[in-house]
Swiss-Prot record:
Family, similarity comment: Belongs to the ankyrin SOCS box (ASB) family.
Example GO BP: intracellular signal transduction
This protein's UniProt keywords: ANK repeat, Repeat, Ubl conjugation pathway
Keyword Cell cycle applies: no
Matching Pfam families: Ank, Ank_2, Ank_3, SOCS_box
Name listed for the protein in its UniProt record: Ankyrin repeat and SOCS box protein 18
Coiled-coil zones: none
Record PANTHER family: ANKYRIN REPEAT AND PROTEIN KINASE DOMAIN-CONTAINING PROTEIN (PTHR24198), ANKYRIN REPEAT AND SOCS BOX PROTEIN 10-RELATED (PTHR24198:SF173)
SUPFAM superfamilies in the record: Ankyrin repeat, SOCS box-like
Superkingdom assignment: Eukaryota
ANK repeat residue numbers: 15-45, 57-87, 119-148, 151-180, 184-213, 218-247, 251-292, 293-322, 326-362
Length: 467
């Protein structure tokens, strides 16, 4: 019988658990340590911290007749509570807790959820989760099992999640399995997810953790986890211990692909991700590796409007014209997400692609781009200037919301002024030079004996109006 099926040594209703939960809730670490080190017996006792199991609470409002096949009860419920025999049941982890929702949310059918919430743990897991090194040492000296995981997570998992290097080291020194999988199929190394967990990761590897171990439903390796979170120092550590730079996860992603597809919110995260990708590329990562959807790292970087990362990938040979299974190019991905990206990032991304030889949008599709990116006129300007001559139609005005038009009136007036006028000679010269240089424009233009303003003009720097 598993620990999950066995009665816990200290059920939720026990006095010790009540005091322990109170101490945990208030952050009373001294009381927590006292309870788990001196009052809980045996040392590997199973403690129940949560249990919403309806079967143990007779007062719960659960229609047991539905589960037990009571026809009369079911008929009564149909008459009183819902009117649709196709009521939706959402089942998660086997729990059976009835949650009534308003008609406004789910209509007349309502929603029945069957959800199980139970948390089992041990004193050692609690001590490791809170970083109580002395408590962990005391429990281990009393022969606590370092691999016990009655709730699906062991003490080493908890230590790594909490970035507690000293606790992780103690557990490993006392025989904790560095590759022990939790209930989600993740090893401790997969749980080193923050910059502060670097020490835990190093301890795990020095104690024999498998650096190439796949884990979880996504079959990510530790290098994938580091890449997804922009942990460049973790990635360097893993590569030093033999991690394969182009290993693929269950979605066909390499670590580079995973890094480019992760959203970076702060400038620090952006910088770490850029360093990580540069590290992977120096280590031999394929800049154009495709995932199961045929998306390259460049597709993903463009989808997040990260011009610095796009430049890095293109310098390492990424294909600016690559198409995914849906027929979308990196440029298309950049345009699709332009209105959601931070200021200046979308047009910089589009500039980078066009200056590295990406084909522009098919002319007939330009009205659609205008409709999608109207709020970002800089993107429209950069893209429009990539054509030698694109006929402007007055009908395009319908694609621009009135408030957007008024907000960016100078630019859109200059756009529609070209409806019956050819582009200026300076623009035509720009297009001729760019056509001559092709995808080498970004390298050759800066070498021309021209003022910086003209070099920027040749590289499609937006000016705010068209001529």
């Amino acid at each position: 019988m598993s620990s999950w099926d066995s009665p816990p040594d200290y059920p939720l209703s026990s006095d010790i658990v009540r005091r322990l939960k109170s101490a945990l809730a208030t952050g009373d670490e001294d009381t927590v340590q006292k309870l788990i080190c001196t009052e809980v017996e045996p040392v590997d006792a199973v403690i129940e911290l949560a249990n919403d199991d309806w079967m143990k609470e007779p007062s719960a409002e659960l229609p047991t007749g539905v589960l037990l096949g009571d026809l009369d009860h079911i008929r009564l419920l149909m008459d009183q509570c819902f009117w649709d025999a196709n009521a939706v049941f959402e089942i998660s982890n086997g729990e059976m807790e009835w949650q009534v929702t308003s008609l406004a949310t789910f209509g007349l059918s309502g929603l029945w959820t069957l959800e199980y919430q139970r948390e089992l743990t041990t004193p050692l897991c609690i001590a490791a989760a809170h970083g109580h090194e002395s408590c962990v040492r005391h429990l281990l000296s009393r022969k606590a099992d370092p691999n016990a995981s009655p709730g699906g997570r062991g003490a080493l998992h908890e230590a790594c999640l909490g970035n507690h290097t000293a606790c992780a080291r103690l557990l490993l020194q006392h025989g904790a399995d560095p590759d022990l999988l939790n209930s989600e199929g993740l090893a401790p190394l997969h749980l080193c997810r923050t910059p502060a967990s670097l020490g835990c990761a190093r301890e795990l590897l020095e104690h024999g953790a498998t650096v190439q171990l796949e884990g979880g439903p996504g079959r990510d390796t530790p290098l994938h986890v580091a890449a997804q979170r922009g942990l460049d120092e973790h990635a360097q550590l893993y590569l030093g211990f033999g991690a394969r730079v182009d290993a693929r996860n269950g979605r066909g992603e390499t670590a580079l692909s995973a890094a480019c597809g992760a959203a970076a919110r702060s400038p620090d995260e952006h910088a770490r991700c850029l360093r990580l990708c540069a590290l992977l590329l120096r280590g031999g990562a394929a800049a154009d590796a495709r995932d199961e959807d045929e998306r390259s790292p460049l597709h993903k970087a463009c989808g997040h409007a990260r011009p610095g990362l796009c430049t890095l990938l293109l310098r390492h040979g990424a294909d600016a014209g690559a198409l995914d299974y849906g027929g979308a190019s990196p440029l298309a991905r950049a345009l699709q997400t332009a209105t959601c990206a931070p200021p200046t990032a979308p047009q910089r991304t589009v500039q980078v692609l066009l200056n590295h030889g990406s084909r522009s949008v098919w002319p007939d599709a330009f009205p659609k781009v205008l409709r999608t990116c109207a709020q970002v006129p800089e993107v429209i300007e950069v893209l429009f200037n990539s054509y030698t001559q694109l006929p402007v139609s007055e009908s395009w005005r319908e694609a621009i919301p009135e408030e957007v038009y008024q907000m960016h009136k100078p630019f859109y007036r200059s756009l529609f002024a070209l409806a019956h006028t050819p582009r200026c000679l300076q623009h035509l010269c720009r297009c001729t030079i760019r056509k001559l240089f092709g995808k080498e424009s970004v390298h050759l233009v800066p070498q021309l004996p021209l003022p910086e303003t003209l070099q920027n003009y040749l590289l499609l720097e937006p000016e705010g109006v068209l001529c």
